[in-house]
Protein backbone atom coordinates (compact mmCIF):
# COMPACT_ATOMS: atom_id res chain seq x y z
CA UNK A 1 0.00 0.00 0.00
CA UNK A 2 1.22 3.52 -0.79
CA UNK A 3 2.37 5.72 2.08
CA UNK A 4 -0.27 8.42 1.36
CA UNK A 5 -3.83 7.13 1.09
CA UNK A 6 -7.37 7.19 2.48
CA UNK A 7 -8.68 4.27 4.54
CA UNK A 8 -12.21 3.72 5.86
CA UNK A 9 -13.71 1.57 8.63
CA UNK A 10 -17.25 1.33 9.95
CA UNK A 11 -19.02 0.33 13.14
CA UNK A 12 -22.62 -0.16 14.23
CA UNK A 13 -24.41 0.37 17.52
CA UNK A 14 -25.80 -2.26 19.87
CA UNK A 15 -29.23 -1.57 18.35
CA UNK A 16 -28.24 -2.52 14.81
CA UNK A 17 -30.23 -5.66 13.91
CA UNK A 18 -27.15 -7.81 13.27
CA UNK A 19 -25.72 -6.72 16.62
CA UNK A 20 -29.02 -7.47 18.35
CA UNK A 21 -28.63 -11.01 17.00
CA UNK A 22 -24.98 -11.21 18.09
CA UNK A 23 -25.82 -10.04 21.61
CA UNK A 24 -28.67 -12.54 22.00
CA UNK A 25 -26.37 -15.35 20.84
CA UNK A 26 -23.67 -14.35 23.32
CA UNK A 27 -26.21 -13.84 26.13
CA UNK A 28 -27.32 -17.43 25.56
CA UNK A 29 -23.69 -18.56 25.62
CA UNK A 30 -22.99 -16.68 28.87
CA UNK A 31 -26.06 -18.10 30.59
CA UNK A 32 -24.93 -21.62 29.70
CA UNK A 33 -21.28 -21.10 30.68
CA UNK A 34 -22.38 -19.73 34.06
CA UNK A 35 -23.77 -23.20 34.83
CA UNK A 36 -21.72 -25.50 32.59
CA UNK A 37 -18.33 -24.17 31.53
CA UNK A 38 -17.59 -27.21 29.36
CA UNK A 39 -20.77 -26.89 27.28
CA UNK A 40 -20.64 -26.99 23.50
CA UNK A 41 -22.51 -24.00 22.13
CA UNK A 42 -23.12 -22.72 18.61
CA UNK A 43 -26.04 -20.34 19.08
CA UNK A 44 -27.41 -18.53 16.04
CA UNK A 45 -30.08 -15.82 16.10
CA UNK A 46 -32.35 -14.25 13.50
CA UNK A 47 -34.45 -11.21 14.38
CA UNK A 48 -37.06 -9.49 12.25
CA UNK A 49 -40.11 -7.33 12.91
CA UNK A 50 -41.67 -8.83 16.03
CA UNK A 51 -39.86 -12.16 15.67
CA UNK A 52 -36.73 -13.77 17.10
CA UNK A 53 -35.57 -17.23 16.01
CA UNK A 54 -32.96 -19.10 18.06
CA UNK A 55 -31.28 -22.04 16.32
CA UNK A 56 -27.99 -23.92 16.28
CA UNK A 57 -26.35 -26.72 18.24
CA UNK A 58 -26.07 -26.83 22.04
CA UNK A 59 -24.91 -29.71 24.24
CA UNK A 60 -25.10 -28.82 27.93
CA UNK A 61 -26.29 -29.80 31.39
CA UNK A 62 -27.39 -26.21 32.05
CA UNK A 63 -31.04 -25.34 32.55
CA UNK A 64 -31.58 -22.07 30.68
CA UNK A 65 -34.69 -20.08 29.79
CA UNK A 66 -33.73 -19.13 26.24
CA UNK A 67 -36.89 -17.14 25.57
CA UNK A 68 -36.40 -14.95 28.62
CA UNK A 69 -32.74 -14.38 27.75
CA UNK A 70 -33.73 -13.12 24.30
CA UNK A 71 -36.36 -10.79 25.76
CA UNK A 72 -34.00 -9.47 28.46
CA UNK A 73 -31.30 -8.74 25.88
CA UNK A 74 -33.69 -6.85 23.61
CA UNK A 75 -34.89 -4.84 26.62
CA UNK A 76 -31.33 -3.99 27.72
CA UNK A 77 -30.49 -2.74 24.24
CA UNK A 78 -33.45 -0.37 24.42
CA UNK A 79 -36.14 -1.91 22.24
CA UNK A 80 -39.05 -1.43 24.63
CA UNK A 81 -41.54 0.15 22.25
CA UNK A 82 -43.05 -1.21 19.04
CA UNK A 83 -42.36 2.15 17.39
CA UNK A 84 -38.62 1.39 17.63
CA UNK A 85 -38.76 -1.72 15.43
CA UNK A 86 -39.18 -4.51 17.99
CA UNK A 87 -40.57 -4.68 21.52
CA UNK A 88 -39.17 -7.15 24.03
CA UNK A 89 -42.59 -7.60 25.65
CA UNK A 90 -44.54 -8.56 22.55
CA UNK A 91 -42.10 -10.20 20.15
CA UNK A 92 -42.41 -13.90 19.38
CA UNK A 93 -39.37 -16.05 20.24
CA UNK A 94 -38.96 -19.44 18.55
CA UNK A 95 -36.38 -21.93 19.88
CA UNK A 96 -34.89 -24.62 17.61
CA UNK A 97 -31.61 -25.83 19.11
CA UNK A 98 -30.14 -29.26 18.32
CA UNK A 99 -27.23 -31.03 20.03
CA UNK A 100 -23.67 -31.00 18.70
CA UNK A 101 -22.97 -33.76 16.19
CA UNK A 102 -21.22 -36.73 17.86
CA UNK A 103 -18.91 -36.90 14.84
CA UNK A 104 -17.64 -33.42 15.70
CA UNK A 105 -17.63 -34.03 19.46
CA UNK A 106 -15.31 -37.03 19.24
CA UNK A 107 -12.64 -34.94 17.54
CA UNK A 108 -12.99 -32.01 19.89
CA UNK A 109 -12.98 -34.07 23.07
CA UNK A 110 -9.87 -36.03 22.09
CA UNK A 111 -7.27 -34.63 19.71
CA UNK A 112 -5.92 -37.03 17.11
CA UNK A 113 -2.37 -35.72 17.57
CA UNK A 114 -2.33 -35.18 21.35
CA UNK A 115 -4.31 -37.43 23.66
CA UNK A 116 -4.10 -35.01 26.59
CA UNK A 117 -5.35 -31.97 24.74
CA UNK A 118 -8.54 -30.79 23.17
CA UNK A 119 -8.72 -30.81 19.39
CA UNK A 120 -9.82 -27.83 17.35
CA UNK A 121 -13.59 -27.66 16.88
CA UNK A 122 -13.24 -27.10 13.15
CA UNK A 123 -10.70 -26.42 10.47
CA UNK A 124 -10.03 -22.80 9.64
CA UNK A 125 -7.68 -19.85 9.54
CA UNK A 126 -7.68 -16.89 11.91
CA UNK A 127 -5.89 -13.55 11.98
CA UNK A 128 -4.77 -11.24 14.75
CA UNK A 129 -3.51 -7.71 14.28
CA UNK A 130 -2.05 -4.81 16.23
CA UNK A 131 -0.43 -1.51 15.32
CA UNK A 132 0.78 1.61 17.08
CA UNK A 133 -1.84 4.02 15.67
CA UNK A 134 -3.67 4.29 19.02
CA UNK A 135 -2.68 3.64 22.67
CA UNK A 136 -4.87 0.52 22.53
CA UNK A 137 -2.73 -0.71 19.61
CA UNK A 138 -5.68 -0.71 17.22
CA UNK A 139 -6.07 0.86 13.77
CA UNK A 140 -7.27 4.45 14.10
CA UNK A 141 -10.36 4.20 11.81
CA UNK A 142 -12.06 1.23 13.48
CA UNK A 143 -11.17 2.35 17.00
CA UNK A 144 -12.87 5.71 16.57
CA UNK A 145 -15.77 4.30 14.55
CA UNK A 146 -16.58 2.20 17.61
CA UNK A 147 -16.26 5.15 19.98
CA UNK A 148 -18.72 7.20 17.89
CA UNK A 149 -21.58 4.71 18.09
CA UNK A 150 -20.70 3.99 21.71
CA UNK A 151 -21.23 7.68 22.47
CA UNK A 152 -24.50 7.68 20.53
CA UNK A 153 -25.68 4.95 22.90
CA UNK A 154 -24.48 6.87 25.95
CA UNK A 155 -26.35 10.05 25.00
CA UNK A 156 -29.46 8.03 24.20
CA UNK A 157 -29.40 6.23 27.53
CA UNK A 158 -28.63 9.20 29.77
CA UNK A 159 -31.34 11.33 28.15
CA UNK A 160 -29.16 14.14 26.84
CA UNK A 161 -30.47 13.48 23.32
CA UNK A 162 -33.87 11.92 24.07
CA UNK A 163 -34.87 11.68 20.40
CA UNK A 164 -32.15 9.12 19.67
CA UNK A 165 -33.19 5.51 19.12
CA UNK A 166 -31.09 2.32 19.37
CA UNK A 167 -30.02 1.73 15.75
CA UNK A 168 -26.98 3.63 14.47
CA UNK A 169 -23.98 3.30 12.15
CA UNK A 170 -20.69 5.16 11.87
CA UNK A 171 -17.96 5.33 9.24
CA UNK A 172 -14.59 7.04 9.57
CA UNK A 173 -12.30 7.79 6.61
CA UNK A 174 -8.75 8.68 7.61
CA UNK A 175 -6.05 10.32 5.50
CA UNK A 176 -2.67 8.66 5.98
CA UNK A 177 0.56 10.54 5.26
CA UNK A 178 3.86 8.65 5.34
CA UNK A 179 1.89 5.61 6.45
CA UNK A 180 0.53 7.28 9.60
CA UNK A 181 -2.89 8.80 10.43
CA UNK A 182 -2.77 12.48 9.51
CA UNK A 183 -6.38 13.70 9.59
CA UNK A 184 -9.99 12.57 9.46
CA UNK A 185 -11.25 13.13 5.92
CA UNK A 186 -14.91 12.12 6.32
CA UNK A 187 -17.24 11.02 9.10
CA UNK A 188 -20.56 9.35 8.34
CA UNK A 189 -22.99 8.91 11.21
CA UNK A 190 -26.52 7.65 10.71
CA UNK A 191 -28.77 7.36 13.74
CA UNK A 192 -32.32 6.23 14.19
CA UNK A 193 -34.46 9.02 15.63
CA UNK A 194 -37.96 9.94 16.69
CA UNK A 195 -40.15 11.43 13.94
CA UNK A 196 -40.55 14.82 15.64
CA UNK A 197 -36.96 16.06 15.16
CA UNK A 198 -35.69 17.96 12.12
CA UNK A 199 -32.69 17.01 10.00
CA UNK A 200 -31.02 20.32 10.90
CA UNK A 201 -31.39 19.60 14.62
CA UNK A 202 -30.05 16.08 14.18
CA UNK A 203 -27.03 17.28 12.20
CA UNK A 204 -26.05 19.94 14.72
CA UNK A 205 -26.46 17.65 17.73
CA UNK A 206 -24.60 14.73 16.15
CA UNK A 207 -21.64 16.87 15.09
CA UNK A 208 -21.38 18.86 18.33
CA UNK A 209 -22.42 16.22 20.89
CA UNK A 210 -21.25 12.94 19.36
CA UNK A 211 -18.53 13.45 16.75
CA UNK A 212 -16.43 16.33 18.08
CA UNK A 213 -16.20 15.07 21.69
CA UNK A 214 -14.93 11.69 20.42
CA UNK A 215 -12.45 12.45 17.64
CA UNK A 216 -9.12 14.15 18.48
CA UNK A 217 -9.47 17.85 17.66
CA UNK A 218 -6.10 17.97 15.93
CA UNK A 219 -7.33 15.33 13.44
CA UNK A 220 -10.34 17.39 12.32
CA UNK A 221 -8.84 19.30 9.40
CA UNK A 222 -11.42 20.25 6.76
CA UNK A 223 -13.35 17.15 7.78
CA UNK A 224 -16.57 16.40 5.91
CA UNK A 225 -19.57 15.39 8.05
CA UNK A 226 -22.37 13.27 6.58
CA UNK A 227 -25.15 12.96 9.16
CA UNK A 228 -28.19 10.83 8.26
CA UNK A 229 -27.46 11.44 4.57
CA UNK A 230 -30.78 9.89 3.45
CA UNK A 231 -32.56 12.64 5.40
CA UNK A 232 -34.68 10.36 7.58
CA UNK A 233 -34.04 7.30 9.79
CA UNK A 234 -37.17 6.61 11.84
CA UNK A 235 -37.69 2.96 10.89
CA UNK A 236 -34.73 0.96 12.15
CA UNK A 237 -33.61 -2.04 14.12
CA UNK A 238 -35.01 -5.45 13.15
CA UNK A 239 -37.97 -3.74 11.46
CA UNK A 240 -35.69 -1.91 9.06
CA UNK A 241 -33.47 -4.92 8.32
CA UNK A 242 -33.47 -8.57 9.31
CA UNK A 243 -30.65 -9.23 11.78
CA UNK A 244 -28.43 -12.32 11.77
CA UNK A 245 -25.63 -13.52 14.01
CA UNK A 246 -22.18 -13.25 12.46
CA UNK A 247 -22.81 -10.67 9.75
CA UNK A 248 -20.53 -7.96 11.15
CA UNK A 249 -17.20 -9.77 11.24
CA UNK A 250 -15.15 -6.80 9.99
CA UNK A 251 -16.80 -4.48 12.52
CA UNK A 252 -15.97 -7.07 15.18
CA UNK A 253 -12.27 -7.15 14.31
CA UNK A 254 -10.03 -4.55 12.62
CA UNK A 255 -12.28 -2.66 10.24
CA UNK A 256 -10.61 -4.14 7.16
CA UNK A 257 -7.06 -3.21 8.21
CA UNK A 258 -6.18 -6.91 8.44
CA UNK A 259 -7.43 -10.00 6.60
CA UNK A 260 -10.22 -12.05 8.16
CA UNK A 261 -10.43 -15.83 8.15
CA UNK A 262 -14.21 -15.75 7.67
CA UNK A 263 -15.41 -17.24 10.94
CA UNK A 264 -17.73 -15.21 13.14
CA UNK A 265 -17.42 -15.04 16.93
CA UNK A 266 -20.75 -14.58 18.69
CA UNK A 267 -22.63 -17.56 20.07
CA UNK A 268 -19.59 -19.85 19.94
CA UNK A 269 -17.99 -21.48 22.99
CA UNK A 270 -14.17 -21.41 23.24
CA UNK A 271 -13.72 -24.87 21.70
CA UNK A 272 -14.52 -23.13 18.41
CA UNK A 273 -11.19 -21.79 17.18
CA UNK A 274 -13.03 -19.28 14.99
CA UNK A 275 -13.37 -17.34 18.22
CA UNK A 276 -10.71 -18.49 20.68
CA UNK A 277 -7.82 -18.59 18.20
CA UNK A 278 -8.74 -15.17 16.80
CA UNK A 279 -8.59 -13.82 20.35
CA UNK A 280 -5.24 -15.55 20.86
CA UNK A 281 -3.89 -14.15 17.60
CA UNK A 282 -4.82 -10.63 18.75
CA UNK A 283 -3.09 -11.35 22.08
CA UNK A 284 0.05 -12.41 20.25
CA UNK A 285 0.04 -9.46 17.84
CA UNK A 286 -0.58 -6.92 20.59
CA UNK A 287 2.27 -8.26 22.69
CA UNK A 288 4.62 -8.19 19.72
CA UNK A 289 3.84 -4.51 19.11
CA UNK A 290 3.87 -3.65 22.83
CA UNK A 291 7.31 -5.28 23.11
CA UNK A 292 8.73 -2.96 20.47
CA UNK A 293 9.55 -5.83 18.12
CA UNK A 294 7.41 -4.19 15.40
CA UNK A 295 5.13 -1.20 14.81
CA UNK A 296 2.59 -3.42 13.05
CA UNK A 297 2.01 -7.13 13.44
CA UNK A 298 -0.31 -9.51 11.64
CA UNK A 299 -0.53 -13.10 12.87
CA UNK A 300 -2.13 -15.98 11.00
CA UNK A 301 -2.90 -19.32 12.62
CA UNK A 302 -4.73 -22.29 11.11
CA UNK A 303 -6.16 -25.54 12.43
CA UNK A 304 -7.56 -28.91 11.36
CA UNK A 305 -10.63 -30.31 13.08
CA UNK A 306 -9.72 -32.68 15.89
CA UNK A 307 -6.03 -31.69 15.84
CA UNK A 308 -4.69 -29.69 18.77
CA UNK A 309 -1.58 -28.06 17.36
CA UNK A 310 -1.94 -25.27 14.81
CA UNK A 311 -0.91 -26.13 11.27
CA UNK A 312 0.90 -22.82 10.90
CA UNK A 313 1.78 -19.73 12.92
CA UNK A 314 2.86 -16.97 10.54
CA UNK A 315 3.90 -13.42 11.43
CA UNK A 316 3.99 -10.47 9.05
CA UNK A 317 5.17 -7.05 10.26
CA UNK A 318 4.95 -5.14 6.94
CA UNK A 319 8.61 -4.14 7.14
CA UNK A 320 8.34 -2.62 10.62
CA UNK A 321 10.01 -5.47 12.53
CA UNK A 322 13.23 -5.02 14.50
CA UNK A 323 14.12 -8.66 13.80
CA UNK A 324 13.05 -10.97 10.92
CA UNK A 325 9.41 -12.02 10.86
CA UNK A 326 10.39 -15.69 10.92
CA UNK A 327 12.32 -15.12 14.14
CA UNK A 328 9.31 -13.38 15.70
CA UNK A 329 7.17 -16.37 14.70
CA UNK A 330 9.64 -18.67 16.49
CA UNK A 331 9.43 -16.54 19.63
CA UNK A 332 5.64 -16.61 19.44
CA UNK A 333 5.59 -20.40 19.42
CA UNK A 334 7.98 -20.47 22.37
CA UNK A 335 5.96 -18.05 24.51
CA UNK A 336 2.32 -18.76 23.58
CA UNK A 337 0.45 -22.07 23.74
CA UNK A 338 -1.80 -21.92 20.69
CA UNK A 339 -3.45 -25.31 21.10
CA UNK A 340 -7.18 -24.83 21.78
CA UNK A 341 -6.92 -26.02 25.38
CA UNK A 342 -3.79 -23.91 25.85
CA UNK A 343 -5.62 -20.84 24.55
CA UNK A 344 -8.57 -21.43 26.88
CA UNK A 345 -6.24 -21.70 29.88
CA UNK A 346 -3.98 -18.82 28.81
CA UNK A 347 -6.87 -16.39 28.34
CA UNK A 348 -9.28 -17.86 30.94
CA UNK A 349 -12.04 -18.22 28.38
CA UNK A 350 -14.45 -20.54 30.23
CA UNK A 351 -16.18 -17.54 31.81
CA UNK A 352 -19.52 -15.88 31.01
CA UNK A 353 -17.83 -12.82 29.50
CA UNK A 354 -19.04 -12.78 25.94
CA UNK A 355 -22.18 -10.64 25.77
CA UNK A 356 -20.07 -7.53 26.38
CA UNK A 357 -17.89 -8.38 23.37
CA UNK A 358 -20.87 -8.53 21.00
CA UNK A 359 -21.14 -4.75 20.50
CA UNK A 360 -18.44 -2.09 19.96
CA UNK A 361 -15.66 -4.47 18.98
CA UNK A 362 -13.98 -7.56 20.38
CA UNK A 363 -10.57 -5.86 20.39
CA UNK A 364 -9.04 -2.63 21.65
CA UNK A 365 -11.09 -2.56 24.87
CA UNK A 366 -9.09 -2.63 28.06
CA UNK A 367 -11.69 -4.02 30.44
CA UNK A 368 -11.22 -6.98 32.84
CA UNK A 369 -13.18 -9.42 30.68
CA UNK A 370 -10.93 -8.82 27.67
CA UNK A 371 -7.96 -10.93 28.79
CA UNK A 372 -6.61 -11.09 25.23
CA UNK A 373 -5.89 -7.35 25.45
CA UNK A 374 -3.22 -7.83 28.13
CA UNK A 375 0.42 -7.10 27.25
CA UNK A 376 1.89 -9.26 29.99
CA UNK A 377 4.20 -11.16 27.63
CA UNK A 378 5.76 -8.09 26.00
CA UNK A 379 8.74 -7.90 28.35
CA UNK A 380 9.57 -11.59 27.89
CA UNK A 381 9.38 -11.28 24.09
CA UNK A 382 11.63 -8.24 24.14
CA UNK A 383 14.18 -9.98 26.34
CA UNK A 384 14.14 -13.13 24.22
CA UNK A 385 14.73 -11.02 21.11
CA UNK A 386 17.76 -9.41 22.74
CA UNK A 387 16.40 -5.85 22.47
Swiss-Prot record:
Named cofactor requirement(s)? Mg(2+); K(+)
Q: Where is this region: Flexible loop?
A: 100-110
Q: What does the UniProt function comment say about this protein?
A: Catalyzes the formation of S-adenosylmethionine (AdoMet) from methionine and ATP. The overall synthetic reaction is composed of two sequential steps, AdoMet formation and the subsequent tripolyphosphate hydrolysis which occurs prior to release of AdoMet from the enzyme.
Entry's PROSITE patterns? ADOMET_SYNTHASE_1, ADOMET_SYNTHASE_2
Question: Which InterPro entries does the record match to this protein?
Answer: ADOMET_SYNTHASE_CS, S-AdoMet_synt_C, S-AdoMet_synt_central, S-AdoMet_synt_N, S-AdoMet_synthetase, S-AdoMet_synthetase_sfam
* Subunit and interaction comment: Homotetramer; dimer of dimers.
Keyword line: ATP-binding, Cytoplasm, Magnesium, Metal-binding, Nucleotide-binding, One-carbon metabolism, Potassium, Transferase
Q: Which reaction does it catalyse?
A: L-methionine + ATP + H2O = S-adenosyl-L-methionine + phosphate + diphosphate
Q: Which organism is it from?
A: Cupriavidus necator (strain ATCC 17699 / DSM 428 / KCTC 22496 / NCIMB 10442 / H16 / Stanier 337) (Ralstonia eutropha)
- Annotated K(+) binding lies at 44
Per UniProt, Mg(2+) binds at: 18
The pathway to which it is assigned is: Amino-acid biosynthesis; S-adenosyl-L-methionine biosynthesis; S-adenosyl-L-methionine from L-methionine: step 1/1
Recorded family membership: Belongs to the AdoMet synthase family.
Tell me the compartments it is located in: Cytoplasm
UniProt key word Zinc: no
Q: Which GO terms describe its cellular component?
A: cytoplasm
Q: Name one GO molecular function term.
A: magnesium ion binding
Please list the GO biological process terms of this entry: one-carbon metabolic process; S-adenosylmethionine biosynthetic process
Location (main, coarse):
cytoplasm
Main EC class of this protein? transferase
Q: Which SUPFAM superfamilies match?
A: S-adenosylmethionine synthetase (SSF55973)
Q: How is the cofactor bound?
A: Binds 2 divalent ions per subunit. Binds 1 potassium ion per subunit.
Per the record, the gene is: metK
Enzyme nomenclature, EC number: 2.5.1.6
Question: Which Gene3D superfamilies does this UniProt record tie to the protein?
Answer: 3.30.300.10
Please give the name of this protein.
S-adenosylmethionine synthase
Ligand binding (ATP): 16, 167-169, 232-233, 241, 247-248, 264, 268
Pfam family example for this protein? S-AdoMet_synt_N
